[in-house]
Amino acid sequence: MLDPGLLPPDALFIMQVFDSRFLPATFALCLLQFLFGPRAEAEQKLRMPNIFGDQMVLQRDNPIRIWGWAGAECPVVVSFAGQSQSTAADRDGKWEVLLQALPAHSSGQAFTVKSREEVLSFKDVLVGDVWLCGGQSNMEWRLRGSRDADLEIPSSNYPGLRFIRIRPGGSPAPQDNFPKEKGEGAWLPCSPETAGDCSGVAYFFGQRLHRHLNVPIGLINAAWGGTMAQHWVSRETLETLPAAQTYLGDYDRKCREWVDGGREEGASKRFTLAQEQWQALAEDARKRGDKDPPGKPNRRDYQNPAEGRIPAGPLNAMIMPLAGLNLRGVLFYQGENNSFGDAWIPFRETFPAVVSDWRRLFRNNDLPFGIIQIAGWSTRRSMTYDMNHHTNVVREVQFNTWRSTSNTGLIVSFDANSNSSIHPGRKHPVGDRAARWALSEVHGVMDDARRKPLQWRGPVYESMKKEKDRIHIAFEEGSDEGLRLERADARGFYIAGRDKIFHHAEARVIAARDAPPQVEVWSDDVPDPVAVRYAWSNLPLGSLMNGKELPAYPFRTDTWPLKPHYGEALYEIAPGDEG
């Protein structure tokens, strides 16, 4: 059978079109075999995915999966750290071995793969913990563009901290490899010369783990700015999600139009024609004194639809080449682009699907998954708090995914933004908080002074109780230790009566003897309160934290439907999502 991973991009596009049932799939495969098959088979040699290379880190304490390709049915021997494993490639040239589990090892060792006369050799390979750091631009954001980079980079000499950046891209079909070019697709030890290209969040996360655990840390940065959750979920899974059908249908329609229009030439003609038609309408409107009509053609809408940010595209191009790799866990920072327009609508289905899909791809149904809750951001048009902004939906979906999915963690980041930008420059606190979660929940690190697990959560809302004209808020045990308001400031609290109109509220921490602390919330404008919200806006303000200065999670005590902008749909909490 023809291996799709060996096909050139044009062939993959053809396969995508046929797979969408525009023509019979069997005919497509026969055509592709005729066009590309003989050449691909003739060129089959010993090779491995680019995730394997010089200076890489392999996952400790578990059998290590190694795979690649060789001549059909040729013998293959993999040797590393004093052990060798033999196998033979199958008829399609694919092979796979499992090395025995190894402890952490900070001294670089040679890694070799042999098949008859062919040899692949990788040098300076370490054994430690490997983390996949995915998402969109805030995870892609390089250390050199982060706050205090001028202080951090000169001291970033950590030979045991390694990272690899996977070039952003999309594909209509799953890929077996990613490109290695222009400094991307290759492992690098962290040093003042290289650290600036590491993801800022991933760097601070990995650096803290490396220093605390004293083992090598490998960071795989597979992030792409502007992506949505549906871009990181497989096509097969998306087809089972009702809210994703609009996106799939729109993509398939664009594929049909592209092919029917004659690919690039036809697309250019359609764009020119659409421009002429719109210009004619605009001239008529101006003569009448009206505004320009909507729908001005955008050349991007006439590009190859199988390129770029398409449903499942980044997953196919950036994650599928890693499928089956041994990982310690995942750190995922995504959601900003699902807070634009009506992109929040499928998020409740697609975001949890990222977790389940990635766990399936990496063959670990309990793979630790750290979720970074999106930061606050705003625009010049909306600098005040906005209860119905899409970001509130996104953060609540992220919170509910954490609460309903085992072995996940949620890291707060809304307070890391000091400039209202969608790209906060302060990556250090976000990386540190993520490291707290990993150390506590994944590695079981204890706080010796407290004789308790290392604290990683801020206060988590648990319940409310009305006391006359005030509401008392209780928090989950363990998250409320040292509960306090920064400088006794009540920023971020809002309270409403039965009219569902929220007002800025006053708040204070109260603590009866032998009872856990609570927050008392009130407003003279709301004599009969029924609901409280905290840090509930597009650019949240908040002052509530625990003794470790970990911020409280945004919360609301009500379940009232939200009406996010730009759409008529309501957002309501699904049964069982109350947290």
Protein language model annotation of sequence segments:
Residues 43-579:
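Cell-envelope and extracellular/periplasmic
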Residues 25-34:
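Bacterial N-terminal signal peptides
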Residues 1, 6, 26, 529-530:
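Short, solvent-exposed linear motifs at loop/edge-of-secondary-structure regions
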